[in-house]
C-alpha cells in the first residue's frame, strides 16, 4: 500500500472523503490502497521507498524530517523541479548536502501527472548515480501505461525537467490565448 502524508489536517480529511486530490490533478480517483495520515512517523513505517512530492522550496525541510525518523537506508524518489532559492542547488544536490549517503532517484518527464492519473501512455526518466535506487521506484511505478528509463545524468535530467516546466507553462498560455499551432511550435 501507499501512505500519503500531509501536515495539513484539512487536506488529509478532504483526501479521505473524496479519494482524490481535487487540485493536483483534479478528477483522478485515488485507489483504495492509499492510506492518508498527518503523521510522518506513521507514513514512513515499513516504507520500501519514500516519494517526496513537494515544491523545491520545501524539499530541505522534508528530507531533514525524514532523516530524523527514518535514517538513510530507504531510497527517496524526488519529483520536484528547479533550483532552490538562495542556494541555487538542484533537488539532488540538496539531498547530497544534507545526507551524503542517502539513496535517491530523480523523476522527470516528459510527463504530466494528469496523464499518469488518467492512465495515458507515459514515459519518465529515473535519474540516479546508482541504478539500484532507480530500480526500486521503477518496479513501484511499473504499469502497462507507464514506462521508466534509467539515466545517470542527474544534472541533465534535473535541468531538463525544470526547463520542460517553463515551456509547458508557456505552451498552455499560448493555447489559452488561441495563438494556434505555429506559436506553439
Residue ranges and their predicted role:
Residues 10-14, 85-87, 134:
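Short, charged/polar "capping" segments at the starts of alpha-helices
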Residues 58, 69, 94-103, 121-185:
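Internal alpha-helical scaffold of NAD(P)-dependent oxidoreductase catalytic cores
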Residues 1-28, 33-38, 65:
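NAD(P)+-binding Rossmann beta1-loop-alpha1 motif at the extreme N-terminus of oxidoreductases
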Residues 30, 36-121, 137:
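Rossmann-like NAD(P)(H) cofactor-binding subdomain of soluble oxidoreductases
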Residues 7, 79-81, 129:
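Cofactor-binding loop segments of dinucleotide-utilizing enzymes, especially the Rossmann-like FAD-
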